[in-house]
Every structure is written in C-alpha cells, then in structure tokens.
Amino acid sequence: MSKLNKSIIAEFESAQITRQVPQFSQGDTIVVNVKVKEGNRERLQAYEGVVIATKNAGLNSAFTVRKISHGYGVERVFQTHSPIIESIEIKRRGKVRAAKLYYLRGLEGKAARIKEDLAATAQEKLARKTVTAKAG
C-alpha cells in the first residue's frame, strides 16, 4: 500500500472518531452502557466487569471485558468507537503488571481479585475536586 493510500485511510479514520473515550487499561473495572435494540424499542444495558485485554489500532481499537454472571465467566469484546456504546464509566483502577489478563479465566472467587491502584484513584479524585472547585 502506498503512502498516499495510507494517509487517506488515516485521515478517514480520524474523521470517524467523534467521541472521546476515557483512558482505561487492563485491570480496571468499568461499566459499559450498551444500546440494545429490542423490536422497535431501544434501551441501555449496563455491562460491568474487568478489562482483561485492549487492542489499540485507531478506529479498529477494541477491548475485552470479563464479568462473572450467575457463577459463569462471561467475556464480551467491544469496539471502542462503536455507535452501540453509549458511555464508558471507570469504577475502579486496577494494579496489574501483565498486558493481557487471560490468566483470570482459570481463577475464581477471591483468587481472581485484582489489587486496586490507590495512587491513580487518589489522583482522579483530586482532579475532580479541582474541576468542581473551579466551576463553583
């Protein structure tokens, strides 16, 4: 592929990315609000779990979220810039050293817990306080 074609594709992809997505990484617990279409109605469904993998590839970026539902592990892959994602909320920052947390699939109960990154959580709280203080 020539440089011209690559630049055209990159320009097109950057135009398609319209929404700002919060910065999250593996180990973080997030809530993804997904638009679900049922018949002629559309509603929001919250999917809360731990991010076990991310793929950063511009418009084709994706992340995998794992949760335990009724005793069974459920994983769902979301396209980061998909129109079905209404919002992404970070509940808790996790402290992990691995890039992919696939080892969580073999763990259950307390063994599958992830240590909280207290430093990142404190920084976010401080940032929110300063924003509200400036606004008020």
Curated annotation (Swiss-Prot):
It comes from the Bacteria. Gene3D superfamilies: 2.30.30.790. The keyword rRNA processing does not apply. GO terms for biological process: translation. One of its GO terms (molecular function) is structural constituent of ribosome. This protein is located at the 30S-50S ribosomal subunit interface and may play a role in the structure and function of the aminoacyl-tRNA binding site. NCBIfam families: rplS_bact. This is Large ribosomal subunit protein bL19. It comes from Xylella fastidiosa (strain 9a5c). The gene is rplS.
